Swiss-Prot record:
Keyword Signal in record: no
One cellular-component annotation, GO: nucleolus
Basic residues bias spans: 126-143
Region: Required for RNA-binding, residue numbers: 51-143
Name recorded for this polypeptide: PRKR-interacting protein 1
One example of a Gene Ontology biological process annotation: RNA splicing
Region feature Interaction with EIF2AK2, mapped onto this chain: 1-50
Region (Required for nuclear localization): 126-138
Region annotated Disordered, chain positions: 39-61, 119-186
Cross-referenced Pfam families: DUF1168
Protein localization: Nucleus; Nucleus, Nucleolus
Subunit structure of this chain's protein: Component of the pre-catalytic and post-catalytic spliceosome complexes. Interacts with EIF2AK2.
Length: 186
């Protein structure tokens, strides 16, 4: 039994160092303190609250049994019941109007977004077409330059080959020019 008593006794926990009480003076200091507390133990899971659902009024009752107004003849407590029903109905109508307005604004936003997207696509297509045109123009200019270079090389080759033979031919032409043109025997 002594062994069970010894095993049930836990070792004493180490004493935590006392922390100074810091009172935040503004929202930034409060946020800083919260972050410091979270970062002391990064392994601990952080509770992230869910997004609160939007408030919606209760649906109207299926059947209203006691239809009454604020007219004379109603009991002293009936006016308060009527007032609460009226307030609830006005809240429901305001909610429906707000939701309709929100849906209308969302639809307008989506239309505007679609128009902007189409305009951006058109502008991009226009610029793409312009870039392609410039690219083709540069490619065509490059081809023309290569063709001119080939033609100039070919013409220089043709000029070099006949130029050696042209000197001999030019000598014979000079002789022909010296001879009278009326002789046709050659």
């Amino acid at each position: 039994m002594a062994s069970s008593a010894a095993s049930s006794v836990r070792p004493p926990r180490p004493k935590k160092e006392p922390q100074a009480l810091i009172i935040p003076k503004n929202a930034a200091e409060e946020q800083k303190l919260k972050l410091e507390r979270l970062m002391k133990n990064p392994d601990k899971a952080v509770p992230i609250p869910e997004k609160m659902s939007e408030w919606a009024p209760r649906p109207p009752p299926e059947f209203v049994r006691d239809v009454m107004g604020s007219s004379a003849g109603a009991g002293s407590g009936e006016f308060h019941v009527y007032r609460h029903l009226r307030r609830r109905e006005y809240q429901r109508q305001d909610y429906m109007d707000a939701m309709a307005e929100k849906q209308k604004l969302e639809a307008e936003f989506q239309k505007r977004l679609e128009r902007n997207k189409i305009a951006a696509e058109e502008q991009t297509a226009k610029r793409r077409k312009k870039r392609q045109k410039l690219k083709e123009k540069k490619l065509l200019a490059k081809k023309m330059k290569l063709e001119q270079k080939k033609q100039s090389e070919a013409s220089s080759e043709t000029q070099e080959q006949p130029s050696s033979g042209s000197e001999e031919a030019s000598g014979t032409e000079d002789e022909e020019e010296d001879a009278p043109s009326f002789i046709t025997g050659r």
